[in-house]
């Protein structure tokens, strides 16, 4: 799996393109290696940095694997439960939210889950689950208060006073599809191919 990934990465680099993110099968292969005790720092870096966040199929596999680690259903030396929770917190929402809420409900690693969820705003219906937990779970209450205070926004770095931009002026009626391969692109990093 790794050999094929690195070959493809090199081929894309030669074309001036970033590597494609890992797909669901590749993420599952990495999870299987960790579960069988063959995990490595190299695989951890790929799992942390090369899986698309959100609701991609690969993100689903990653979130499920990390959830099992966080709930201590499986274990690996390189990814203790606290690290798994932190990694879920970097996935920007999507499948990671359900996993984090499941861990929050156990009342174990609550501080870690709270830290991860305080800065995750794409939680959709899971908001109600966390809201309902706040009377019996201090960390759920902490998350709700953090969202109410907009900590996810106010803790961001200040916007620069001056930003240099390139503006494209297109005459007539237009939309972003004129600058994007839209449904034809595998990912947003492929946009430079069009321009």
Where on the chain are the PLM-derived regions?
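Amphipathic alpha-helical packing elements
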Residues: 2-31
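Active-site-flanking structural segment that lines cofactor/substrate pockets
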Residues: 34, 38-43, 192-195
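Short amphipathic alpha-helical segments enriched in leucine
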Residues: 31, 35, 47-51, 184
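Amphipathic alpha-helical scaffolding segments comprising HEAT/armadillo-like alpha-solenoid repeats
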Residues: 24-32, 53-72, 91-105, 122-134
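Residue-level signal for cytosolic alpha-helical hairpin/rod architecture
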Residues: 6, 27, 81-82, 97
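Structural detector for internal amphipathic alpha-helices that build alpha-solenoid repeat scaffolds
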Residues: 17-20, 41-57, 71, 78-93, ...
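Fe-S-dependent hydro-lyases/dehydratases of central metabolism
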Residues: 113-195
């Amino acid at each position: 799996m790794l050999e094929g990934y690195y070959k493809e990465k090199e081929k894309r680099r030669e074309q001036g393109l970033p590597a494609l993110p890992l797909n669901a099968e590749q993420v599952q292969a990495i999870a299987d290696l960790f579960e069988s005790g063959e995990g490595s720092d190299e695989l951890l870096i790929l799992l942390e940095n090369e899986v698309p966040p959100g609701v991609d199929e690969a993100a689903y596999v990653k979130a499920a694997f990390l959830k099992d680690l966080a709930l201590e259903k499986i274990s690996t030396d390189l990814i203790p439960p606290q690290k798994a929770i932190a990694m879920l917190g970097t996935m920007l929402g999507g499948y990671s939210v359900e996993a984090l809420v499941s861990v929050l409900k156990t009342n174990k690693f609550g501080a870690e889950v709270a830290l991860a969820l305080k800065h995750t705003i794409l939680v959709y219906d899971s908001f109600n689950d966390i809201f309902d937990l706040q009377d019996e779970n201090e960390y759920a209450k902490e998350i709700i208060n953090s969202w109410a205070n907009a900590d996810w926004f106010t803790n961001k770095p200040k916007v620069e006073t001056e930003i240099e931009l390139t503006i494209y002026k297109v005459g007539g009626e237009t939309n972003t599809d004129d600058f994007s391969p839209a449904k034809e692109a595998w990912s947003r990093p492929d946009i430079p191919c069009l321009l």
